[in-house]
């Protein structure tokens, strides 16, 4: 419990003793508010209460920690390892406490909601130190800072901050803050350190001892801003996070720190911010740290919130408020700042057109959009308060709620136009989605074919994104994109004009996959040049109707130079082109070759890479993360013209009469056409040494499957019964997951033949009980019944690499610097400004050695599989099996003899096989000769038979005469029957006079029966 404050205790009147009053209750609710703020008062009061406990309470159990854990997190498990941030990650200067946000005068009351524990960390200020994650490594559960004396947190960015964050230090978390820097912590130098970390840390600390003592004794003159971020490197040598329960890892929106790819680690005593080289590296670090603190996250049920906000425009603000430096829109969720827009200034309406998307948010209740001046200390101009329950389905449309929202606290008529979409997901344990993952893995082509005509464009985009994310986590995204692209080729019938130009599930899946794997490629290839063009004020308009004729030559020259720069960046980007995309493009070209349309291979690559990725990224850099905001009209026109030129160059299509003002660029297209075709051939060539493995997952698979389950349930609710029956057992699986009961059906497992060579197929007698998604390309299993998943091991089971993935031992070499742990790529420092050196000159004559894919798995840290049913397979089943994997040294000679005998047998068998092959070839030749002789004899026999039977023609004539006689006999019989009928008729008639009766004339009978 929390201790009462001294002031409140002094005012308490004495009461009669009771079992409740005999115990000293600890409550920090009324602690004094000092300079550290309310939270620091709670911590100080709690610490004093713990250090001055009465003897009567010593036998009572330990008080419950006042730090609350995240509601979506599982209970903390007992473990001995602790995550520590070493090498002085804390500074003397601390940020001021978080004050309440200034509200507008006389604000209108917001709807009262039931209080909810804050679970989103407080946003950091833009001037906090940001640590480069490349200087850290994760060893034995410890986040260790390594490097020379010049390394440290990045310089803080000075600027206006519209939000404040409080950082407090709990005294119980510090480990010997005043100890000598040269000393080595015994726990850090334990026997379980690998690669001699103990000696490494000791040498680094001794190396900095002299400078640390000198820096401590030297006077610090000047303002704190002049000292930069080096002030935070002086006192703390080790910060223990393992003792806290409220440790959270949180991705940060780029608008908060004006730095991309950052994440924040918070605990009860403070927080630290880290920056990564790419979004993929940031996601891997977040996953590793979260799994350390929440090892059983995949085995518990939790709730997550997805939120998408489109901020369009605002109207009705006072002219003075919209003046420079402008107005921002801030996104607050349950009192925590998530992101902010770029500032906009000017008279009239202010336009942003910015989109914010957040995944895996904790359960939240209220969203607030606040308009605030961009200057330092500006007040809130107005706000929009919304309850998330009103924004979800079915209360709001599936596309989100879009309208003009009145601004509270603003003048009458002021409104903000935005579109908001929220979804609350119930995420079940991973094994509950096992059958759904199996169906998607084995039958995605069948699912896409059945739903293609029944979905809208938005539904296709969402379903394709969910499928790609799930299959990327299980290692089958490449197969999905390759198969869908091949199906799109067959659907278009070889017509180039239709390739990847329609809104189909194939095109949406390809778009999502390229955004995932080529995010860093876009930044490295187009990021710098696109940002320079967005900030440029040079006019490149070449339409004579939109610019003076005197400026036209200068504008054409600028456009030509800009197109050349962009094109050279693209064709020289082969060395860092994603290997995953190269594998997909190679599969497409092989499919075109198998169909007899080899010429369509480059067109297919061009339509996907340029039409769906590179040119859209040039047109809309803000949508692809190349710029923070949409460019101004002038730079936007320049980017549009550049995208036109690059697309026509890729399509080998010169400008015609439709865009006659661009005809001056046709010479540019002719000159650079061969280089473009060479680049298309390069990116579609697979390098076996750098080809990525099938398993690349680093995301929350349970969350992605929950999203897919929710989308499929929404889709199947509107499908006709025939389509549902055609997709069985998927409807049964979805219904069983929704009701929380076991799936009563079996998922048939069948896969096409593997595309790559080198995978061993399963023998006819082996039938595995369960096939891991990572091993799908190796086998074609036949499983009679979906089996229940094995129990998931703890966090320590994934730290050991699998036997088949172990690399051969490398020669020891001096340790200069560690690698960034999840990235697996040598760390390098990139300059903050200035152009990046790029290879110039002629193109590569052949395939250049491709660098390590940025999205590849880490080489220094064994990755924990996201698929829970794979983790137990990463290690031997029992101790005996682990021991049985190593042969005793004493049997080496025996094994060598066996190998020699087997080699002799192999040689004998090889000779026998060769002799049999020779004999078979000779028999085949003899058989061919005998067949030829038989045909010759048959022809001679027919000729001799014809010569020996000269009366064959006479017998033929007699046969014809016999047939004619038969016909005449039939005619006579018919005449005779007619005669009999006539005689009978005459006998029945009454007799009349002979003058009136006339006999029927009959033909005179012929003697020989011939009428001729």
Swiss-Prot record:
Residues 100-113 have a biased composition (Acidic residues). It comes from the Eukaryota. Pfam families: PH_RASGAP, RasGAP. The record marks 501 as: Arginine finger. It is found in: Cytoplasm; Cytoplasm, Cell cortex. CDD domains: PH_RASAL3 (cd13374), RasGAP_DAB2IP (cd05136). Its main location: cytoplasm. Residues 1-128, 147-196, 208-229, 752-887, 990-1012 are annotated as: Disordered. Residues 285-405 form the C2 domain. Residues 826-841 have a biased composition (Basic residues). InterPro entries: C2_dom, C2_domain_sf, Ras_GTPase, RasGAP_CS, RasGAP_dom, Rho_GTPase_activation_prot. The modification Phosphothreonine is found at residue 235. The keyword Cytoplasm applies. Residues 160-171 have a biased composition (Low complexity). SMART domains: RasGAP. Residues 7-21, 50-62, 990-999 have a biased composition (Polar residues). Keywords: Coiled coil, Cytoplasm, GTPase activation, Phosphoprotein. The modification Phosphoserine is found at residues 18, 51, 160, 162-163, 166, 212, 225, 229, 232, 788, 791. Residues 475-683 form the Ras-GAP domain. Residues 889-989 form a coiled coil. The keyword Disulfide bond does not apply. GO terms for biological process: negative regulation of Ras protein signal transduction; positive regulation of NK T cell proliferation. Residues 193-294 form the PH domain. GO terms for cellular component: cell cortex; cytoplasm; cytoplasmic side of membrane. Functions as a Ras GTPase-activating protein. Plays an important role in the expansion and functions of natural killer T (NKT) cells in the liver by negatively regulating RAS activity and the down-stream ERK signaling pathway. This is RAS protein activator like-3. It comes from Bos taurus (Bovine). The lineage of its organism: Eukaryota, Metazoa, Chordata, Craniata, Vertebrata. The gene is RASAL3.
């Amino acid at each position: 419990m929390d201790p009462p404050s001294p002031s409140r205790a002094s005012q308490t009147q004495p009461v009669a003793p009771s079992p409740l009053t005999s115990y000293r209750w600890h409550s920090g609710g009324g602690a004094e508010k000092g300079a550290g703020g309310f939270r620091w008062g709670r911590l100080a009061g709690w610490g004093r209460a713990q250090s001055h406990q009465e003897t009567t309470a010593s036998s009572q159990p330990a008080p419950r920690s006042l730090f609350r854990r995240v509601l979506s997190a599982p209970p903390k498990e007992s473990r001995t390892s602790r995550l520590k941030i070493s090498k002085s990650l804390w500074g003397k200067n601390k940020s001021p406490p978080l004050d309440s946000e200034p509200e507008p005068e006389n604000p209108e009351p917001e709807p009262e909601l039931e209080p909810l524990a804050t679970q989103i960390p407080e946003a950091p200020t833009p001037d906090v130190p940001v640590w480069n994650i490349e200087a850290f490594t994760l060893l034995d559960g410890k986040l260790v800072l390594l490097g020379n004396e010049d390394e440290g947190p990045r310089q803080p960015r000075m600027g206006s901050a519209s939000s404040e964050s409080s950082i407090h230090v709990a005294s119980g978390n510090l480990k010997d803050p005043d100890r000598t820097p040269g000393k080595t912590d015994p726990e850090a130098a334990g026997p379980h350190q690998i690669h001699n970390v103990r000696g490494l840390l000791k040498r680094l600390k001794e190396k900095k001892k002299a400078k640390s003592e000198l820096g401590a004794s030297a006077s610090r003159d000047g303002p704190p801003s002049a000292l930069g971020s080096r002030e935070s490197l002086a006192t703390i040598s080790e910060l223990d996070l393992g003792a806290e329960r409220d440790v959270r890892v949180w991705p940060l929106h780029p608008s908060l720190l004006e730095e991309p790819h950052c994440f924040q680690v918070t605990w009860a005593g403070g927080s630290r911010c880290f920056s990564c080289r790419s979004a993929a590296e940031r996601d891997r670090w977040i996953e590793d740290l979260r799994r350390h603190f929440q090892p059983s996250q995949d085995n518990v049920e939790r709730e997550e919130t997805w939120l998408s906000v489109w901020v369009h425009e605002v109207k009705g603000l006072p002219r003075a408020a919209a003046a420079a430096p402008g107005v921002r829109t801030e996104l607050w969720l349950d009192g925590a700042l998530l992101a902010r827009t770029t500032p906009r200034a000017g008279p009239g309406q202010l336009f942003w057109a910015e989109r914010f998307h957040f995944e895996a948010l904790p359960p939240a209740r209220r969203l607030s959009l606040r308009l605030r001046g961009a200057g330092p200390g500006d007040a809130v101009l107005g706000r929009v308060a919304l309850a998330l329950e009103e924004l979800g389905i079915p209360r709001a449309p599936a596309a989100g709620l879009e309208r003009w929202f009145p601004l509270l606290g603003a003048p009458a008529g002021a409104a903000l136009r935005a579109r908001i979409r929220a979804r609350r997901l119930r995420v079940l344990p991973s094994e509950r989605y096992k059958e759904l993952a199996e169906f998607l893995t084995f039958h995605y082509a069948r699912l896409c074919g059945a739903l293609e005509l029944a979905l809208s464009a938005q539904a296709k985009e969402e379903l394709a994104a969910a499928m790609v994310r799930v299959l990327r986590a299980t290692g089958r995204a490449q197969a999905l994109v390759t198969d869908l692209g091949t199906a799109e080729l067959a659907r278009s019938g070889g017509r180039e004009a239709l390739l990847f130009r329609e809104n189909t599930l194939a095109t949406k899946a390809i778009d999502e996959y390229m955004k995932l794997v080529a995010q860093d490629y876009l930044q490295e290839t187009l990021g710098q040049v696109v940002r320079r063009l967005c900030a440029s004020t040079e006019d490149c308009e070449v339409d004579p109707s939109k610019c003076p004729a005197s400026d036209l030559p200068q504008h054409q020259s600028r456009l030509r130079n800009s197109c050349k720069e962009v094109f050279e960046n693209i064709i020289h980007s082969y060395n860092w082109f994603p290997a995953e995309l190269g594998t997909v493009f190679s599969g497409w070209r092989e499919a075109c070759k198998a169909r007899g349309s080899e010429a369509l291979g480059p067109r297919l690559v061009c339509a996907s890479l340029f039409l769906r990725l590179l040119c859209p990224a040039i047109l809309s850099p803000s949508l692809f993360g190349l710029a923070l905001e949409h460019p101004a009209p002038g730079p936007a026109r320049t980017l549009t013209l550049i995208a036109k030129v690059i697309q026509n160059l890729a399509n080998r299509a010169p400008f015609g009469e439709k865009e006659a003002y661009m005809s001056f660029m046709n010479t540019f297209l002719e000159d650079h056409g061969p280089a473009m075709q060479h680049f298309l051939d390069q990116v579609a060539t697979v390098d076996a040494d750098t080809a990525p493995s099938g398993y690349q997952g680093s995301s929350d698979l349970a969350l992605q499957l929950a999203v897919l389950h929710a989308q499929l349930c929404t889709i199947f609710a509107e499908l006709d019964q025939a389509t549902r029956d055609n997709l069985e057992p998927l409807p049964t699986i979805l219904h069983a997951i929704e009701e929380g009961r076991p799936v009563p059906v079996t998922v048939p497992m069948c896969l096409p033949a593997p595309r790559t060579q080198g995978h061993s197929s399963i023998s006819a007698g082996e039938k595995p009980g369960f096939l891991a998604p990572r091993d799908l390309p190796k086998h074609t299993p036949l499983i009679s019944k979906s089996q229940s998943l094995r129990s998931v091991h703890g966090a320590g089971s994934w730290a050991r690499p699998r036997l088949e993935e172990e690399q051969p031992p490398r020669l020891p070499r001096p340790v200069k610097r560690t690698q960034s742990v999840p990235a697996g790529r040598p760390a390098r420092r990139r300059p903050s400004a200035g152009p990046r050196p790029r290879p110039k000159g002629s193109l590569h004559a052949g395939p250049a050695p491709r660098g390590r894919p940025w999205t590849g798995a880490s080489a220094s840290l064994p990755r924990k599989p996201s698929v829970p049913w794979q983790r137990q397979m990463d290690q031997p089943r029992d101790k005996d099996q682990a021991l049985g994997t190593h042969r005793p040294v004493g049997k080496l000679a025996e094994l060598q003899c066996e190998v020699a005998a087997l080699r002799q047998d192999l040689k004998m068998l090889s000779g026998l096989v060769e002799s049999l092959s020779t004999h078979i070839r000779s028999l085949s030749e003899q058989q061919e000769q005998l067949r030829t002789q038989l045909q010759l004899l048959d022809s001679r026999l027919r000729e001799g038979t014809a010569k020996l039977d000269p009366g064959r023609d006479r017998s033929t004539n007699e046969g014809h005469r016999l047939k004619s006689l038969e016909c005449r006999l039939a005619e006579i019989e018919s005449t005779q029957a007619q005669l009999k009928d006539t005689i009978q008729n005459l006998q029945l008639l009454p007799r009349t006079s002979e003058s009136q009766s006339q006999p029927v004339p009959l033909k005179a009978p012929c003697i020989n029966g011939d009428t001729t």
